[in-house]
Amino acid sequence: MLRRGALSTILKGLNGLSLRSPIPIWHVSASPEVGSKYNLPTVPTTSHVSYRQIAKANFFAGYRPLSANQICVPKVESKTQVSQSQDEEDQPQEYVLSLEDGYLYAQSFSASGSVTQTQPARISTQVWEQICDKLISITPLDLTSVKRKRKLKMNKHKFKKRLRRQRALRKRLGK
């Protein structure tokens, strides 16, 4: 008499699934029909970023304005404000660079902190590549092998162990 195995009994209970055609995970994120048919969660696609884009973002991260949604509204100046603004013109202005959709926006700020003007400028890809190459070449790389790191760690451990032993010996000898 042949007996049915436990695995085949479990598989008989699973009517909706087919073991001969498993669903690859990339189909779940690609088509919503597969996810709804088999009641599986969908996964958003991954957008891969090149190292050049990361270098650009890191470079311009320090030059972003404090508020990205800051809107400059011109104000009507009175005579006293005009005289103050003439004094401010003698002082040096600060410029803040921001990058949006491939355009570099240079905003000049007066000493009081108000935005005086914004100038968009398109930067060519050749200039971007030069900036990225310069940033990447400046960044120091610490190429220490795993074997060397382990050796340094063990030497440090042995040195500390020897110091502790010597300190304990001095303490016992009464020095």
Curated annotation (Swiss-Prot):
GO terms for cellular component: matrix side of mitochondrial inner membrane; mitochondrion; ribonucleoprotein complex; ribosome. It is found in: Mitochondrion; Mitochondrion inner membrane. It comes from the Eukaryota. The keyword Amino-acid biosynthesis does not apply. Pfam families: COX24_C (PF08213), Pet20 (PF08692). GO terms for biological process: mitochondrial mRNA processing; positive regulation of proteolysis. Keywords: Membrane, Mitochondrion, Mitochondrion inner membrane, mRNA processing, Ribonucleoprotein, Ribosomal protein. InterPro entries: Pet20-like, Ribosomal_mS38_C. It is a peripheral membrane protein. Belongs to the mitochondrion-specific ribosomal protein mS38 family. Component of the mitochondrial ribosome (mitoribosome), a dedicated translation machinery responsible for the synthesis of mitochondrial genome-encoded proteins, including at least some of the essential transmembrane subunits of the mitochondrial respiratory chain. The mitoribosomes are attached to the mitochondrial inner membrane and translation products are cotranslationally integrated into the membrane. mS38 is also involved in the splicing of the COX1 mRNA. Component of the mitochondrial small ribosomal subunit (mt-SSU). Mature yeast 74S mitochondrial ribosomes consist of a small (37S) and a large (54S) subunit. The 37S small subunit contains a 15S ribosomal RNA (15S mt-rRNA) and at least 32 different proteins. The 54S large subunit contains a 21S rRNA (21S mt-rRNA) and at least 45 different proteins. This is Small ribosomal subunit protein mS38. The gene is cox24.
